[in-house]
């Protein structure tokens, strides 16, 4: 289907311990492997729906101002801008669905359909599922099920050499938008909402997976561009990881993060997201 799979996130819901905690986290994230030019690429990238669940359960109210403007969708004309922003709109769709914003969700569906068509990543299954979402727009539970199961089945595209770069760009857009929503709602302060902070920090577990996917594609300027932009976020995660004792696996529910380091990664996520949304 069109591409941007709702891959289950590396945001755990309860504290665990040691090696088993990490294994359980990876298992729950449904870590997959796909062959690409002889290399095994492991990925457990964040699901927009999963991050939206964290936001929904954190007690924070719906904040439409953090979402990308739907009216800008028609302005994206290059493969890079269309793919990245298709992923961004996919995350915004999930967020809108969980907060019962049906009319907003419909607008994001329209953007997704338009960009999918422009990228030639739609197929019969994807069109059917998008139509099913429209038909069930007022049924939150049904929508959640549809999105979680079949929003964009990226597996086939990630294994298809000709469209793999496009699929990876969409996944990167989804990843950055999910983190952007969470960091914006936290206000750049790690003490605002412990569950959001933990979710954001735990994405350090999967950053290398995304970087590995990007690195698996050579000779593609669009992929190289995305890689160069997100590497600053990787450095932020390295700094946070070092301060936390060298691990993103926690034995307590709350995570104590240096305020300056947390603010820095929030600012860098925002900067990357802003640039991605302005690729006209």
Where do the protein language model's features map onto the residues?
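C-terminal motif of bacterial Sec signal peptides marking the signal peptidase cleavage site
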Residues: 7-10
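A cross-kingdom marker for long, charged
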Residues: 12, 213-280
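Bacterial lipoprotein signal-peptidase II cleavage site
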Residues: 12-19
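N-terminal Sec/ER secretory leader and immediately downstream segment
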Residues: 20-132
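Long, amphipathic, charge-rich alpha-helical segments that form helical bundles/coiled-coils
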Residues: 68-76, 80-92, 112-133, 137-140, ...
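Non-transmembrane, amphipathic alpha-helical segments
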Residues: 74, 78-81, 93-100, 104, ...
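Secondary-structure edge/capping motif, primarily at the C-terminal ends of alpha-helices
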Residues: 93-100, 119, 157-161, 182-190, ...
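Extended amphipathic alpha-helical interaction segments
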Residues: 138-223
């Amino acid at each position: 289907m069109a591409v941007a799979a709702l891959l289950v996130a590396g945001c755990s819901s309860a504290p665990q311990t040691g090696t088993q905690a990490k294994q359980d986290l990876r298992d729950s994230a449904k870590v997959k492997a796909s062959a690409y030019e002889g290399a095994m690429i492991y990925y457990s990238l964040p699901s927009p729906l999963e991050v939206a669940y964290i936001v929904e359960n954190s007690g924070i109210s719906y904040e439409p101002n953090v979402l990308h403007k739907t009216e800008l969708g028609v302005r994206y004309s290059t493969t890079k801008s269309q793919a990245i922003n298709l992923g961004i709109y996919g995350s915004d769709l999930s967020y809108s669905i969980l907060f019962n914003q049906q009319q907003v969700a419909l607008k994001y569906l329209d953007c997704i359909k338009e960009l999918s068509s422009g990228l030639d990543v739609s197929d019969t299954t994807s069109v059917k599922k998008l139509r099913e979402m429209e038909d069930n727009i007022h049924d939150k539970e049904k929508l959640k099920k549809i999105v979680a199961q079949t929003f964009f089945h990226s597996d086939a595209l990630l294994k298809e050499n000709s469209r793999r770069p496009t699929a990876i760009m969409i996944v990167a857009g989804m990843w950055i938008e999910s983190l952007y929503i969470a960091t914006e709602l936290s206000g750049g302060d790690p003490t605002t909402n412990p569950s959001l902070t933990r979710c954001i920090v735990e994405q350090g577990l999967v950053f290398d997976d995304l970087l590995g996917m990007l690195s698996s594609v050579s000779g593609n300027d669009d992929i190289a561009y995305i890689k160069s932009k997100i590497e600053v976020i990787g450095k932020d995660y390295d700094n946070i990881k070092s301060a936390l004792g060298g691990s993103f696996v926690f034995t307590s529910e709350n995570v104590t993060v240096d305020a300056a380091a947390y603010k820095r990664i929030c600012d860098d996520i925002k900067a990357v997201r802003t640039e991605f949304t302005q690729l006209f």
